[in-house]
Amino acid sequence: MSQLANPELMKVVILLASSVTIVPLFKRLGLGSVLGYLVAGCLIGPSVFGIVQEPTAVVHLAELGVVMFLFIIGLEMYPERLWAMRKAIFGRGLLQVGLCGCLLTFSGIYLLGLTKEVSFIAGMGFTLSSTAIVMQSLEERGLTSTSKGQRVISTLIFEDIAIVPLLASVAFLAPHSKEATPHTDWVSIGIALSAVVGLIVTGKWLMNPLFRLISKARIREMMTAGALLVVLGAALAMEIGGLSMAMGAFVAGVMMSESAFRHQLEADIEPFRGLLLGLFFMGVGMSLDLHLVFNHWILLLGIVFLYILGKASAVYIIARITRLDHREAIGRMSLMAHGGEFAFVLFSAAATAEVISNEEQATFTAAVIISMLFSPIIAQIARKLIQRTEPKHLDQLDENDLDTIVDLEDNVLVIGFGRFSQIVCQTLLIRGISVSVIDRNIENIRAAAKFGFKVYYGDGIRLDVLRAAGIEKAKCVVLGINDTQRIEHIVSQMKEAYPNLPILTRTYDRKTTVSLIKQDVDFIVRETFESAITLSRATLMKLGIDKIEAEEIIKEVRTLDQERLNEEVLHGFSNEIVKKYWTPRPFIKPHLDTKALNKETEEILSEKIEEEISNDHS
């Protein structure tokens, strides 16, 4: 039986089984999902059970998770916002990387006895925090979109940029660096700049036409394929240019941040991002050489303690120098005190160039992994310290955070942007209410641009698209689409996922109305009925009937129709109810008999009377 089992499939099953058992356990214990992934990877890696013998291949594949994560972050960074963050990126980011690098380099030289070159590589590798761990931590705490979270992200962006000159410095530190020529360096810089410019041009002028073309085909999987093409293509372009793949994905995300397709892209990428990011953390855990740890545990713990303490101190000092308060400085310190995945790239390049030995590479890599293992624990300790001085009242909050809170007020999510929804949106905007709209029709999106509405391309029937569009922040949802099946499907999903979220919708027929009433939809406007009632009132008044009397007649019709609707809701869809209520019947008995004015009408009416007589006898 075991001979028939596919060993590769067996590894995949074990990977999934270990993650779905260990990660929720660590999450429940309050240690975070990242530590759970790292421990799960360590257990199935070559140092423990040996189920996966080549963790490097897993890490290389799973790096795409980090790439996709940066793409999603880029989607939330409008170019204007990124420009507004330039001081934080090149100011606080440069200061933090510079001070951390200097402090750790000198610590390695004078406290660990390393050579200048080796100490520089080790110190700068540890200076670069793990983008994956920091972003995951921010997301779990709901801080990604806050001002504090944005300031952390700005530093991460600079660290992603810093890997480029650090890799270039390896060539100068190498024993045979004299062989490199200035011409070669300028060519490398030219290729890198060309990759960046090419990516920006592609994102600005080619991306939107591409997705408009794909959307017209109305093939959902093609949108997913297009999203993956954008992310992986951008990553490949940057890698060819000698830059970070994650940086390429981030730039692509920023270029698409103002596109009407951004929420659809985010929804399509999200499942791949989550799985691959978890796999990345497991791959890092697999890479930990426990034999090296046990043989040199005193040295490793000394390196980890020294570097974490040094980096944490530098992060805190820079935060305070740049006028961040004590609580935020501690939060940044706990988030960024560890080493990151870029250290593996730097150590590998340095070992290849013979700047550091293979033994030193293995030792420094193990130290970085151990620091990543400690990261969730450090964050937990820091969180408890912060909670002691957490503001209890709204007036104590950071004034920049108040902008985030205000943005969530009076937010309405409208699904469908036809003529019906356009009128609804204009009414809301006159009152100053924030409106977000989802539509999958390209022409509707183009029309919306003339009104200045926030309209995004996406299928409102997909819950992941709704989440990406901000349904969790919405005060209510308005359904303006004209497809009754899609209306019922959307309502069913939202009632299950967000039972307390008010839903207001339009309907065309009684059957859909009855179904939505049973699902406790908050408000239903029946277009046919309301249009007919309005026209009836106008007709009565045009015939000279007093307005008060006309209103009384309309009120009576509404009452009789409501009684009929209540019975339809109560008794369901039996044949008797359909026959009794869903065939047109007058609310009250006509005062005069029906008269046929031509022969054809007389034949039709006679057939109808015979049918009713036979039904009564049966």
Curated annotation (Swiss-Prot):
Protein's cellular compartments: Cell inner membrane
Ranges for domain RCK N-terminal: 409-525
GO MF terms held by the record: antiporter activity; monoatomic cation transmembrane transporter activity
Transmembrane segments: 6-26, 32-52, 55-75, 94-114, 118-138, 152-172, 186-206, 227-247, 274-294, 298-318, 336-356, 362-382
GO biological process: potassium ion transport; proton transmembrane transport
Membrane association type: Multi-pass membrane protein
InterPro entries named among the record's database cross-references: Cation/H_exchanger_TM, K/H_exchanger, Na+/solute_symporter_sf, NAD(P)-bd_dom_sf, RCK_N
Keywords (A to Z) from UniProt: Antiport, Cell inner membrane, Cell membrane, Ion transport, Membrane, Potassium, Potassium transport, Transmembrane, Transmembrane helix, Transport
CC per GO annotation: plasma membrane
Main location: membrane
UniProt family annotation: Belongs to the monovalent cation:proton antiporter 2 (CPA2) transporter (TC 2.A.37) family.
Functional note: Transport system that facilitate potassium-efflux, possibly by potassium-proton antiport.
Name of this chain's protein: Glutathione-regulated potassium-efflux system protein
Species this protein is from: Haemophilus influenzae (strain ATCC 51907 / DSM 11121 / KW20 / Rd)
